[in-house]
Amino acid sequence: MGSRVSREEFEWVYTDQPHTDRRREILAKYPEIKSLMKPDPNLIWIITAMFLVQLISLYLVKDLDWKWVIFWSYVFGSCLNHSMTLAIHEISHNFPFGHHKAVWNRWFGIFANLPIGVPYSVSFKRYHMDHHRYLGADGIDVDIPTDFEGWFFCTTFRKLVWVILQPLFYALRPLFINPKPITYLEIINTVTQIILDIIVYYVFGIKSLVYMLAASLLGLGLHPISGHFIAEHYMFLKGHETYSYYGPLNLLTFNVGYHNEHHDFPNVPGKNLPLVRKIAAEYYDKLPQYNSWIKVLYDFVMDDTISPYSRMKRPPKGSENLD
């Protein structure tokens, strides 16, 4: 159903990712950016408050009619849970406690994971570092869709289905592209999450558990905030691999929209990324950028030139230095 996309292959490139050279050039010109590379302890209190708000919402929905459970899971819970996944993104970069307390950050990530209902924070950390070091690398960067996704989701309707099912593909893709041995922290993450889910069921009931899980599923699928999944690296303009978004939803997402800035300086917490853009404005103002994630979702589904194949892909090579 719907017209078929024109792209039938990834955009293969044989050059290094652009962030390495730009980082080096910007730091040579603006060494003061190094002062922005520091922990953000405010994340500890913000994330804890988000956890408590979701805990309160579990109590508030426990006796609602099912239609209102689903309604509030999409309208409210989805925003909170998607925001929490991006808090986990901040934690994966060790921003709450700093790099010298990396283990504290891993435990805090497990804590932040609890309202989402599905364990993933420890695994996300492992794969996300690969995404930065080997951006677009075949068989390493699991942010790149599989060949099956590009081949099958090739019509307007199928692309819409793909957007709705994004959380499923993000969960399963690592198993097919770059499987890794399970670590003890991943086991702890899983066991802790299962225990919390059981507690939610027995204390609040099935409606609260469904609310929590639906909030994650809906919030990571066809949802305005989910536009960032596509906006960050899908090639809407040939030759451009990473795109920033400067709209208001950055307020809910720890500035993940500042994505060129983030990949240029992954050791700068989200709070300081607008300062990076301000300091080095001549570098970022000229790059392609978005002001609406909703429009990104619409264009992805409706534009026949865009599909899951619209990613720049490169053969695997040596690791990039992120310092």
UniProtKB/Swiss-Prot annotation:
Lipidation (N-myristoyl glycine): G2
GO cellular component: endoplasmic reticulum membrane; mitochondrial membrane
Positions of short motif Histidine box-1: 89-93
Keyword Membrane: yes
Stored InterPro entries: DES1/DES2 (IPR011388), FA_desaturase_dom (IPR005804), Sphingolipid_d4-desaturase_N (IPR013866)
Main location: mitochondrion
PANTHER family in the cross-refs: SPHINGOLIPID DELTA 4 DESATURASE/C-4 HYDROXYLASE PROTEIN DES2 (PTHR12879), SPHINGOLIPID DELTA(4)-DESATURASE DES1 (PTHR12879:SF2)
Complexes and interactors: Interacts with RLBP1; the interaction increases synthesis of chromophore-precursors by DEGS1.
Family: Belongs to the fatty acid desaturase type 1 family. DEGS subfamily.
Protein name: Sphingolipid delta(4)-desaturase DES1
Protein source organism: Alexandromys fortis
Species classification: Eukaryota, Metazoa, Chordata, Craniata, Vertebrata
Name of the gene encoding the protein in the UniProt record: DEGS1
